[in-house]
Amino acid sequence: MASQTQGIQQLLQAEKRAAEKVADARKRKARRLKQAKEEAQMEVEQYRREREQEFQSKQQAAMGSQGNLSAEVEQATRRQVQGMQSSQQRNRERVLAQLLGMVCEVRPQVHPNYRVTV
């Protein structure tokens, strides 16, 4: 009987060791999966940063030339407005005199299409 209980004890201990090994293997596998997931996440983040940086540089290059164009257009517009204002200042008195002359100087005339009927 003693040898039988001893054999059962050995089997139980072997089963316990096997269960511990399986549990350790599962833990190692979980750790490896977690580590692989973290590494993949870091790679994705690094790739995302690289692409974002590339996009920003291309956008800056495109917007830089557009910004210069915008500044040139704005400067040309200012020059035109300034030219119009100076022209208005130069011609103001002459135009006012012409308008007042046309309004105040009335010359009565008979319309050419008017027919006198007697």
UniProtKB/Swiss-Prot annotation:
Question: Which example biological process does GO assign this protein?
Answer: synaptic vesicle lumen acidification
Show the ranges annotated as biased composition (Basic and acidic residues).
35-55
Q: List cellular component terms (GO).
A: clathrin-coated vesicle membrane; extrinsic component of synaptic vesicle membrane; melanosome; synaptic vesicle membrane; vacuolar proton-transporting V-type ATPase complex; vacuolar proton-transporting V-type ATPase, V1 domain
Q: Does the keyword Glycoprotein apply?
A: no
Kindly indicate whether the keyword Cell membrane belongs to this entry.
no
- Comp. bias (Polar residues): 56-69, 78-89
Q: What is its main location?
A: other
Key words, A-Z: Cytoplasmic vesicle, Hydrogen ion transport, Ion transport, Membrane, Transport
* Compartments where located: Melanosome; Cytoplasmic vesicle, Clathrin-coated vesicle membrane
Pfam families on file: V-ATPase_G
User: Subunit notes for this chain?
Assistant: V-ATPase is a heteromultimeric enzyme made up of two complexes: the ATP-hydrolytic V1 complex and the proton translocation V0 complex. The V1 complex consists of three catalytic AB heterodimers that form a heterohexamer, three peripheral stalks each consisting of EG heterodimers, one central rotor including subunits D and F, and the regulatory subunits C and H. The proton translocation complex V0 consists of the proton transport subunit a, a ring of proteolipid subunits c9c'', rotary subunit d, subunits e and f, and the accessory subunits ATP6AP1/Ac45 and ATP6AP2/PRR.
The Swiss-Prot or TrEMBL record describes its family as follows: Belongs to the V-ATPase G subunit family.
For this entry, the protein name equals V-type proton ATPase subunit G 2
